[in-house]
UniProtKB/Swiss-Prot annotation:
This is Small ribosomal subunit protein uS11. The keyword RNA-binding applies. NCBIfam families: PRK05309.1, uS11_bact. It comes from Leuconostoc mesenteroides subsp. mesenteroides (strain ATCC 8293 / DSM 20343 / BCRC 11652 / CCM 1803 / JCM 6124 / NCDO 523 / NBRC 100496 / NCIMB 8023 / NCTC 12954 / NRRL B-1118 / 37Y). Located on the platform of the 30S subunit, it bridges several disparate RNA helices of the 16S rRNA. Forms part of the Shine-Dalgarno cleft in the 70S ribosome.
Length: 128
């Protein structure tokens, strides 16, 4: 007699405010929306949306990633976000604008890009 497999039902969360972490590198932009404790609620990236190669690093790809993450965060009734931006990429500003345009109220913007106090040696200069 085969036992029935019970699936865990997904509990519908109701989170009013959260934190939008935008990680913008030279190659990609990742947008992750978490609750106040840091548990991931929604995420998206330029690569996950189907952008490949150098198109991932464009501001338009970052805008689309932020819109997708905001849309799935608004499904659980999220209204306000505090934005933290990390990295030197080109999609920083467009991702913040896309979050606001999607209907999320941006309460604060914080730059948390790590700056070394003369840490490890950087990679050699590119000769193109």
């Amino acid at each position: 007699m085969a036992g029935r497999t019970t699936r865990k039902r997904r509990v519908k969360k109701n989170i009013e405010s959260g934190v939008a972490h935008i990680h913008s590198t030279f190659n990609n932009t990742i947008v992750m929306i978490t609750d106040a404790q840091g548990n991931a609620v929604a995420w998206s990236s330029a690569g996950a949306l189907g952008f490949k190669g150098s198109r991932k690093s464009t501001p338009f790809a970052a805008q689309m990633a932020a819109e997708a993450a905001a849309k799935s965060a608004m499904e659980i009734n999220m209204r306000t976000v505090a934005v933290t931006v990390k990295g030197p990429g080109s999609g920083r500003e467009s991702a913040i604008r896309a979050l606001a345009a999607a209907g999320l109220e941006v309460t604060s913007i914080k730059d948390v890009t790590p700056v070394p106090h003369n840490g490890s040696r950087p990679p050699k200069r590119r000769r193109v």
